[in-house]
Amino acid sequence: MAAATLSFGPEREAEPAKEARVVGSELVDTYTVYVIQVTDGNHEWTIKHRYSDFHDLHEKLVAERKIDKSLLPPKKIIGKNSRSLVEKRERDLEVYLQTLLTTFPDVAPRVLAHFLHFHLYEVNGVTAALAEELFEKGEQLLGAGEVFAIRPLQLYAITEQLQQGKPTCASGDAKTDLGHILDFTCRLKYLKVSGTEGPFGTSNIKEQLLPFDLSIFKSLHQVEISHCDAKHIRGLVTSKPTLATMSVRFSATSMKEVLAPEASEFDEWEPEGTATLGGPVTAIIPTWQALTTLDLSHNSICEIDESVKLIPKIEYLDLSHNGLRVVDNLQHLYNLVHLDLSYNKLSSLEGVHTKLGNVKTLNLAGNFLESLSGLHKLYSLVNVDLRDNRIEQLDEVKSIGSLPCLERLTLLNNPLSIIPDYRTKVLSQFGERASEICLDDVATTEKELDTVEVLKAIQKAKDVKSKLSNTEKKAGEDFRLPPAPCIRPGGSPPAAPASASLPQPILSNQGIMFVQEEALASSLSSTDSLPPEDHRPIARACSDSLESIPAGQVASDDLRDVPGAVGGVSPDHAEPEVQVVPGSGQIIFLPFTCIGYTATNQDFIQRLSTLIRQAIERQLPAWIEAANQREEAHGEQGEEEEEEEEEEDVAENRYFEMGPPDAEEEEGSGQGEEDEEDEDEEAEEERLALEWALGADEDFLLEHIRILKVLWCFLIHVQGSIRQFAACLVLTDFGIAVFEIPHQESRGSSQHILSSLRFVFCFPHGDLTEFGFLMPELCLVLKVRHSENTLFIISDAANLHEFHADLRSCFAPQHMAMLCSPILYGSHTTLQEFLRQLLTFYKVAGGSQERSQGCFPVYLVYSDKRMVQTPAGDYSGNIEWASCTLCSAVRRSCCAPSEAVKSAAIPYWLLLTSQHLNVIKADFNPMPNRGTHNCRNRNSFKLSRVPLSTVLLDPTRSCTQPRGAFADGHVLELLVGYRFVTAIFVLPHEKFHFLRVYNQLRASLQDLKTVVISKNPSAKPRNQPAKSRASAEQRLQETPADAPAPAAVPPTASAPAPAEALAPDLAPVQAPGEDRGLTSAEAPAAAEAPAAAEAPAAAEAPAAAEAPAAAEAPAAAEAPAPAEAPAAAEAPAAAEAPAAAEAPAAAEAPASAEAPAPNQAPAPARGPAPARGPAPAGGPAPAEALAQAEVPAQYPSERLIQSTSEENQIPSHLPVCPSLQHIARLRGRAIIDLFHNSIAEVENEELRHLLWSSVVFYQTPGLEVTACVLLSSKAVYFILHDGLRRYFSEPLQDFWHQKNTDYNNSPFHVSQCFVLKLSDLQSVNVGLFDQYFRLTGSSPTQVVTCLTRDSYLTHCFLQHLMLVLSSLERTPSPEPVDKDFYSEFGDKNTGKMENYELIHSSRVKFTYPSEEEVGDLTYIVAQKMADPAKNPALSILLYIQAFQVVTPHLGRGRGPLRPKTLLLTSAEIFLLDEDYIHYPLPEFAKEPPQRDRYRLDDGRRVRDLDRVLMGYYPYPQALTLVFDDTQGHDLMGSVTLDHFGEMPGGPGRVGQGREVQWQVFVPSAESREKLISLLARQWEALCGRELPVELTG
């Protein structure tokens, strides 16, 4: 553009005239917009205005500049949008605008300039707008020191203004004076110039091509330029003395354009201050004296030219995202510390150390580097980023491994980074400094450092061995792994005396789920120091019983699954039966002592290489013969063969072909002949390559067998029959070798296992036809040609993925299409996606929302025997109900098939989700041929889902059962529904991973949970809390023992001394058992591992209890004192209580002090008593409750045992089930044992209080069930009646939940328990007269109301609850706790008490009833009366929760009880239905409940009462109120019209003549006496004589 070529010289052409043309119009809605094109020299831009805009402009110009008023075309009212008018108006408006521009040729008026957008695009307008802006805000910007952003167009306009030589204030407006800009630019320190790509706005101006001058900026310290052309920037060099930071992006093609623009005028130049050598120098250029930071990234710079001589003080240089190919000329930058050369085109670093002397941070990411040899002398390097390069060899890291100052290294996204154990191999290159290196932004872990130490030791041994290789070439061939503690043969090198056993293996992160690394490391290290007897398994009887089972003893019919056990979802699915051959009739598992031996263990690799070489020599003739047979089979194939046989042969030998099989089979016969010729050639090449690569030269084989990966796994080998064994798969560069761990050796030491590895078979890569995942992340499938072998490999996810990736790398990319099976999953599919597909296939509701938390391969052993309980608690012959220990269960499953014991002979998968345990059975039948995969889809898996709440850990396992390495490390006993199941984990550490995940999920469940209650408390069943069991298992694993398998050794067996040390701690736990008569056979039970696991809980309890006892003793002492205060003082005390609620004493005192005694019944004139206090209880009740609530000095204290025994009396009116009856019969310490053995979920939990009550849940508001409420130091447990199970649990129709016919004779009860953790408790609402209380959590599932119907029971529970909460530490609530002044103090002068809310120190809110609630109840009752105006003001005398006895049908006993609220006023008595659970509304409630809080059921006048009958039938102390049903009474006229009608199932009324009977049962004796007393007093006041009270039978 011409504008871009204007020079800055003094001579300039005359300014061209401006033009404005109306080039068109547009119709917008109901008006027309005119398109105007403005031209200013070579600049053009477009604007749009409607006629009204012109009219407004004209009015302002007429007023300000006195132009002709008739110059603008007139308005039109009719036809203003007609085409003819619009065209005429376009011409008139163009003449109007042109006339205005002619009238004001130099500087347009302000309104006209804005109308034509001169302030955006025209030189004078742009400078005027900028000057006005800086006039107003310039000083503020300079004072704040902010970066000022300016556009290239604005700089261009300033430059043009200065070169025109016109007055700085041509418009006459002082605000637009150019001097404001110049004054601002002289003082500005921080500048940012940002251009745009393409035209600016609606103009044709390209900012990046506009020239401008920066010499007007005299004080710049920092400048940032982007999207400009550096060739057109002038004056930047004037800031050399002051500029410290400069950034030029998307603007330059060379460094010289920015740093030395004046150098283009000279042939030779030198920087100022350098000594010349007498050459032809034509110019001396000043240096950038203050520049320390230079950013030239994102430009098009291709070389680092000599202009860098001008920036000698530079410290930070960024040249990233350019096109640099060579690092040059940086030797002049002596102060350079940080250099960024990322994302250039560097391919070599040769000699870079001569140019980068003191660089500390070097970024070379995103280049083409393959070698790092040029960095080996950069001794000052601290941080090097080499990501996204082409570094392949590990040896390249050696170049930087010796740099003394290096701390951070990044090698991500290099070919090097996909090497197995990449991190440890890289870190090993740094030697002793490995701990100081942060690799790939991840700090080095202790585990990695241990691995590095092992690698260093291996490398040192290799170096020593290489020095002796000249004299002992064949020493490695005679190497064998001797069983410990044998001594190495004498021919071994003397330089490695520590090699008498294998080095300590490298343990992967995936292999250790739950166990401390130190314990495992010690178990996998040398075992020579151990005596021989320490190698034998601990549970000798268990091991012998398992290993003595002969092969084939189990019939295949007896090993099939019980119908519906796992495959119950699809019973019609037919499968081809395969003969199941268990390995020697035993349970197979992978021992953990060998999994640490990987491909990095050189001695182990040498052993495997020798075995593989010998196997190849034996199998080589068979492989060559098979290749020849394939060649002959192709030659003998003729045209007379049937098409199906041809297809089979072609499909059998097509593993080098491309494309899917079906597509190629549809091609023509000519193409088929060509394919056969290609196959013949490839088969011949394969055979020749096989003979060459696998020749008889032993030295060649030994030297060239390279082991890529070692995978320890559980293997299912299918070849006509199914065979299972623990295996070691070895992936080499030629094929795969399979080794078996003999089952009888699986319990030995790692030395013994490795020395007894038995070779099974091997096959080259070419024989592999398909491979993929049967289940993603869990089971890898390899299908081998010829022998139709299928290998199902089960291992942990990480090792399987690594093995799969290494196997894929052995094949060319074009061959992978044939090896990927359509019926198997690829590596990209996750377990979560597989679970979603499986649940969708089985149409599980909400299956897409479930997330897998872990999946574990296990054997499942379970019993189906139905036997009755034997006398005296002897369950030794009972299969179903006996302690289902491993030895007995497995022995029966393998040796006694006639007793209907079923065993899963093939592993299942236990998949945990947040709510369910999913049991998955896979089809291990032989894989179908390619092309026939339509018959195999998701129904290859059978699924059974069990709610996680019904799964328990070994609920009845006896603690007398001896344990061992196998049982402790692999066996877990479960109660799933009503079935005992023994899960045998086939992989190491999976049991502890399962326990960890299970405990987390079980603890997070908010629904009902299954608990098991033993019927024989003296037997002390092994049913401790889940976390206690997990910690016990964990302690077994963490024991620092010297045995080869520390996870398997119980403390009593591995270390007798610690067992004796634990005896004093266990004494308090065992003493009560001895008092109950522990026999000599039962005594050792308390000393076994389960009892030891519970010992810390008993030992730590007293110490933990002392602090709460001391802290809350004042509260217990001071609380009874206010109880003696008169009633008149109760209201102020209650009102002031919240102010002191922070102290435990003050918080608990009002709750126990403000209630009147039972004998102080309030008179009607005094008002409702419950409004004054939350806890009306007996006089001595508060003192007794607080005395009982004190934290005992020793747990369990005698007071606690005595109080729980006294409180463990179930009310006679509550319905019970067998499990609750059993609990109610317990006394003394048996209650404490029940809590810890069957109920508690936390290890150090303490029982504090027991309460029997009926409860109502928020989710089932119409159902009231019996519950035993146990308050502990951590939670509130509700053991519920069995009737609630069907409302909360899922349908229980499968195998797991079928009760046996002799279930009632079992030694335990299966019950339901609801747990409300105290940490989830948010508020406690207390009902009127303390008749009930509601516990509210954060969700609807955590809201439950306890209907004690007894103020004393409520009061005791709340006192204990407050005491327990005081010992808990609660984090501050996220909501603001402080209230504003008016809400906190504004209502104190009213004299009325609002809802009494007590904020406990634990942030739990206790809400007590107020006068307002009593007033609401009074109002509701008054509205139901026939004529409220005639009746005196109601005054509630008594409010109690009672039952109305429904008259039973003929021939039946007791009638059912219906919960009712009985209300006694001064003249009436009412029965109401009350909603206890929904009111007051919880915080999470979105809408009001559908039910009203009170619904009046019936009402009678007290004076109509004829007599009161009291008897023991049908319920003890039941009351029958007999009323005279007088005609025309004025109470409840609309409600009681049908008194004499028959109402089947209605309330218990008996209408004989004119009498109506209420049969009322009041559970609380105190409330019952108070009702009779008040009723008699009111009746006497109304009738003038005593109320007749009659006793009946």
From Swiss-Prot:
Interaction with LIMK: annotated span: 661-869
Region (Necessary for binding to phosphoinositide-3-P): 1-134
Biased composition (Acidic residues): 638-650, 662-685
Comp. bias regions, Basic and acidic residues: 466-480
Entry's Gene Ontology cellular component terms: cytosol; early endosome; intercellular bridge; microtubule cytoskeleton; nucleoplasm; plasma membrane; recycling endosome
InterPro entries: Leu-rich_rpt, Leu-rich_rpt_4, LRR_dom_sf, Nischarin_PX, PX_dom, PX_dom_sf
Chain segments carrying region 10 X 6 AA tandem repeat of A-E-A-P-A-A: 1081-1146
Interaction with ITGA5 as annotated region, ranges: 709-807
Region annotation (Necessary for homooligomerization and targeting to endosomes) ranges: 121-695
Protein name: Nischarin
Organism of derivation: Mus musculus
Lineage: Eukaryota, Metazoa, Chordata, Craniata, Vertebrata
